[in-house]
């Protein structure tokens, strides 16, 4: 059975093989793809790492506070510089869901990183 990750869900995703500074291993990631593309077996994700104080001044590290709904082990950060598209075959299992507010904060972080100016 193929996974069908939805926007805002946190999934464990197999990110290997990687190169250079790409974030590695199987780790949580937030799906930010529009539901408009759910029939395509690819998703846009933002990998998640455990929050560290040094992330405070890094605009590409978006705080995701641990909640019962997201089921993260600790406060974490979405690393928007590591955004990528991956096949749904890389998705292991859903572990939780973030709020729409967190999804929007991640998207805003991505907009800042690409210097988008409407």
What is the meaning of each model-derived region?
Residues 1-118:
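Conserved functional hotspots at enzyme active or ligand-binding sites that engage polyanionic ligands
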